[in-house]
Design a protein with these regions (language model features):
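C-terminal beta-strand-rich structural cap/linker in extracellular carbohydrate-active enzymes
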Residues: 566-598
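A short glycine-rich, aromatic-capped structural motif
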Residues: 689-766, 784-787, 856
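Carbohydrate-recognition beta-sandwich/jelly-roll modules
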Residues: 40-278, 283-295, 476, 480-490
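Short, aromatic- and glycine-rich surface loops/edge beta-strands on solvent-exposed regions
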Residues: 579-586, 653-666
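Edge beta-strands of extracellular beta-sandwich domains
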Residues: 590-599, 666-678
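Active-site-proximal substrate-binding groove within the catalytic cores of carbohydrate-active enzymes
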Residues: 203-209, 213, 394, 398-401, ...
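Functional-site microenvironments in short loops/helix caps that host divalent-cation chemistry
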Residues: 703, 756, 761-903, 910-915, ...
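Aromatic- and carboxylate-enriched substrate-binding clefts and catalytic-loop regions
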Residues: 302-453, 457, 468, 476
Length: 934
């Protein structure tokens, strides 16, 4: 039968997971206005829809030497094949007639130097930039990363562009009806000019040409970036071959976030003084700190190559123990979830360039290597991957640089090079191909790594610990490793989100210089937060759609986040650390947060030290002692049904944070955070059910089961009591002793069993020669420990009553204050006589169920033991014959009303035995035998 609900749900899922930034229409024409220079005033879409631009925009703007110029301010001449604009006596700009393209509108422009001096052309920006547009252009000193992204309402931030797109210009702006335009400019070539990263030098008569590509999109400004970078690959490539990305044997790199590269002469790899390898120690440290190292590369070549005639392959084979030892290391590494990399140095001409593919394949085979670090390469090639594949599957190519979009089909991993000292905040390579595995090079010997680790985490990719340069392994390095361990842990647990093909950079925030990226995986959303404000940040940060079926957690701090609703809008807060202002602009700056939006899957609850875990099906449940980490303490459960566990049994006497995580394999699905704090007590006892009675013994009475409500209070609350007010409980029917256990009855137990406690201190202190005083056979037995009482109860086939059972037996369901009614009568009980009385001395003081001697003679032990993180105590009820009157600090004695409860602090069996505490027992029943009985 057709199920419309399932179809609709499937449509919604596809709507959210399939990237969709472009519109059904495309941009067909951009119309020019020539009244003031060359400007754009309207658009025509592929379906002939005409759209006017609210405010005319120049066709482009650019920087001539140090001055920004606009096509809207130039002298214009019409040509048969386009337009020529002249900027003083310096430059001619030729704008060719636009051409149609299936992927939007494009236009070629050419700058020509008409002066007698060399000029510099840079920052060619399609449609210019204003306060309402989003743009990318070069800014600041000439260095490897000087591209800046400008957004309305925020200060610019730096971005990383592909290595062949440093000169790229980008802009986007709203048009009308929810439609926006986005455009890029790409340098196509020069005639007589000199190309530099971000600019072109034009001697006299030299030329440089650019191509402008434009398209339309709907929605947030980020969709324009997605269209140009992710969907159209900056027009570097028309179709993307995903063959390598779809290979299951290479999928491991997409779950990898930590690579270590080390030279063969490093003492952490081989200790020359001891003459032995220390590689196993390195792996062990990696496990302790990071769970594991994803990949480890050993480098025995540069800068040793050239000292003698040996080539790069010889240096591998001449390592101590030879290639056989390296192969052993490969196996050892894989046993510890680490892949072993070798390196390839194509510049090593001594290695016979013609045999390079053959030699590298042979070394992969001999070393059983899992990957190859491609020195001085930004890309790989099919021949190289094929050479590796001919040996074994799963061998990865890892380039020194980052592949440009056209080369990405041939390699699936690369690096943010340490040529860039301070990494830009946003890496747009991650937007181009979200499943391309990126690793930021952190040169340990160069400087501290903190800032670079933070930015890698913000961008959802990994880190390469590069140990080539000596030095840097000091106390700051250990701090960096701890920081890296924390980011790596979150990246791994949320790998599914960080592969989101439709992730969104830089969602709107209430504060500047604190940035948020959004990542989704199924019903989970991850927000990575990067703070570059030295004072730190704590407060409302970004808007969400309020949803009562979701909850929010900081995965960085492992704290619950309560959304803030104001003016009909809902906001999430963030908390990031600050730093000394003097550290800004250095690698000491930067702090992060990571906020998760989860569906309500776990639903775990903490009551006392009892943790309720819901059924998790095939998923894993991890219960953490404190914050989750690679070195943290946790217990794993696979639960087919709801389960209650004791935290004391898991973690001993621990107070603090408890984090519960639900994982599907390695990926986090939900997280609950609880705080297990001492002070407020929780019950640690359980009821050990007896054999169910089918009849009523002469010395017992039936208490019918019921649900009832009662109120309790305590005289002193310095040590907190359990919850006392408005207690509603359901009690099953049971039998209770009519009287407290007497000396005679306890003596019978001793004669029958020969029971003797391990600790005999104060045991039956009032007895002489192992028998009670003459004439006191019917007095309540005292000077017993909890263990003594339970031993008797087991012998009798009974147990101690819970406090609720004692309450019901004493009070009934009418809430009376005393067993006999609401008024106190001194003749109904032992009224603080200062000595014990027989248990049947006050039969008129019975309860509604005819239970006798409930108050005034001895405090009566219940089964309820509590723990507050520091102390154990039992609940006793009813008061006793002893009532100290000389000071208000004493426990109040004498008969106690039924709304008063009292704790008895526990130390040891001997210490706990006293003259005022006795007990009575109860027995479970088979209810079917007692229907209608009272």
């Amino acid at each position: 039968m057709f199920n419309f609900k399932i179809l609709f749900r499937t449509f919604l899922v596809l709507l959210f997971i399939i990237p969709c930034t472009a519109l059904p229409q495309s941009l067909s024409k951009v119309h020019f206005s020539t009244l003031y220079g060359l400007r754009t005033d309207s658009l025509t879409l592929s379906d002939n829809t005409a759209l006017s631009i609210k405010r005319e925009k120049p066709v482009l703007s650019f920087r001539l030497d140090e001055k920004m110029l606009s096509a809207g301010d130039a002298e214009l001449r019409d040509m048969a094949d386009g337009y020529v604009l002249q900027f003083g006596n310096s430059v001619h700009l030729k704008v060719n007639q636009p051409s149609d393209d299936s992927q939007g509108w494009q236009c070629d422009v050419e700058f020509e130097n008409i002066s007698a001096d060399t000029v510099t052309i840079s920052n060619v920006l399609p449609f210019g930039a204003d306060s309402a547009s989003v743009s990318i252009s070069g800014m600041g000193p000439d260095n490897p990363a000087r591209a800046w992204l400008s957004r309305p309402g925020y200060s610019p931030l730096r971005v990383i562009l592909p290595d062949n797109s440093w000169e790229l210009g980008y802009s986007s702006f709203d048009v009308q009806n929810g439609i926006s335009v986005c455009a890029i400019s790409r340098r196509m070539g020069t005639v007589g000019g000199i190309e530099r990263r971000y600019e072109t030098l034009l001697p006299p008569k030299a030329k440089v040409s650019y191509r402008i590509y434009a398209g339309i999109f709907r929605g947030d400004w980020q969709n324009g970036l997605k269209l140009m970078f992710r969907d159209r690959y900056l027009y570097d490539i028309s179709e993307f071959d995903n063959t390598l990305y779809q290979r299951s044997d290479l999928a491991w790199i997409r779950e990898s976030y930590l690579i270590v590269l080390q030279m063969a002469w490093d003492r952490e790899f081989f200790d020359r003084q001891a003459g032995k390898y220390t590689f196993s120690d390195l792996l062990r440290k990696g496990i302790d700190q990071f769970g594991h190292i994803d990949a480890y590369g050993i480098w025995p070549t540069w800068p040793r190559l050239g000292l003698d005639q040996r080539n790069q392959w010889d240096l591998y084979r001449d390592l101590p123990g030879g290639i056989r030892q390296l192969r052993i290391f490969g196996g050892l590494a894989r046993q510890n979830n680490t892949r072993l990399f070798i390196s390839g140095n194509p510049w090593d001409v001594s290695a016979k360039p013609d045999d390079y593919m053959k030699e590298i394949a042979e070394l992969i085979a001999e070393a059983d290597a899992d990957g190859v670090f491609l020195d001085i390469r930004n890309s790989s090639c099919r021949q190289l991957q094929s050479a590796a594949d001919s040996v074994r599957s799963g061998v990865l190519m890892y380039s020194e640089g980052m592949a440009v979009p056209a080369d990405m089909p041939g390699i699936i991993s690369g690096r943010v090079h340490n040529d860039i000292f301070l990494s830009p905040e946003l890496n747009l390579n991650k937007l181009i191909k979200p499943d391309f595995s990126i690793f930021r090079v952190c040169d340990v010997g160069e400087d501290i790594l903190h800032r670079e680790i933070a930015i890698s985490f913000f961008n959802g990719y990994g880190t390469e610990l590069n140990l080539f340069r000596p030095g840097g392994r000091d106390e700051n390095y250990q701090k960096d490793l701890d920081y890296l361990a924390a980011t790596t842990f979150i990246l791994r647990q949320n790998n599914d989100a960080f592969l989101d093909m439709d992730w969104t950079p830089l969602i709107g925030t209430l504060a500047d210089r604190i940035y948020v990226n959004r990542w989704r995986a199924g019903e989970k959303t991850i927000f990575t937060v990067l703070n570059l404000r030295p004072e730190g940040f704590d407060g409302k940060l970004f808007r969400i759609e309020g949803n009562i079926a979701r909850h929010y957690v900081s995965l960085w701090n492992h704290e619950n986040i309560i959304p803030v609703t104001e003016g009909g809008m809902t906001w999430l807060t963030a908390n990031t650390e600050g730093w000394l202002a003097s550290a800004s602009g250095t690698r000491k700056e930067g702090s992060v947060d990571c906020i998760a939006e989860f569906p309500l899957l776990l639903g775990s609850k903490l009551k006392g030290d009892s943790l309720l875990l819901r059924s998790a099906g095939d998923n894993r449940v991890l219960v953490w002692k404190g914050n989750p980490s690679n070195s943290g303490v946790f217990k794993e459960f696979r639960l087919g049904r709801d389960t209650i566990i004791s935290l004391k049994q898991l973690f001993g006497y621990y107070q603090g944070k408890i984090v519960v995580q639900l994982l599907n394999g390695k990926n986090l699905l939900d997280e609950n955070i609880h705080y297990f704090r001492g002070g407020k007590p929780w019950m640690v006892s359980s009821v050990e059910r007896t054999v169910r009675a089918t009849g009523i013994a002469p010395d017992m009475l039936l208490i019918p089961g019921t649900e009832f409500t009662y109120e309790l209070s305590a005289e002193e609350d310095f040590i907190p009591y359990p919850e006392l007010s408005g207690l509603t409980t359901s009690v099953d029917s049971f039998l209770i002793d009519k009287y407290p256990v007497t000396n005679a009855r306890y003596y019978e137990f001793l004669q029958s069993t020969g029971y003797r406690p391990v600790d005999t201190t104060r045991y039956l202190k009032h007895w002489k020669y192992d028998i009670y005083p003459q004439g006191q056979e019917n007095y309540p037995v005292v000077y017993l420990s909890l263990e003594d009482m339970k031993a008797y109860a087991r012998w009798a086939g009974k147990r101690l009553p819970t406090e609720a059972e004692w309450q019901l037996a004493a009070q009934g369901t009418d809430g009376r204050k005393w067993p006999w009614g609401n008024e106190f009568h001194g003749t109904m009980c032992n009224n603080a006589f200062g000595k014990l009385t027989p248990v049947n001395a006050f039969s008129k003081g019975m309860s509604p169920y005819e239970v006798v001697d409930l108050v005034g003679n001895v405090w009566q032990m219940t089964n309820d033991m509590y723990f507050n993180g520091s102390y154990y105590f039992m609940i006793i009820r009813g008061g006793s014959f002893y009532n100290p009157e000389s000071g208000r600090m004493y426990i109040k004695g004498g008969p106690q009303p039924l709304d008063k409860t009292q704790m008895m602090l526990m130390v040891s069996q001997g210490y706990d035995r006293n003259a005022t505490v006795g007990f009575r027992c109860v027995k479970d029943i088979e209810s079917s035998y007692f229907r209608g009985k009272r």
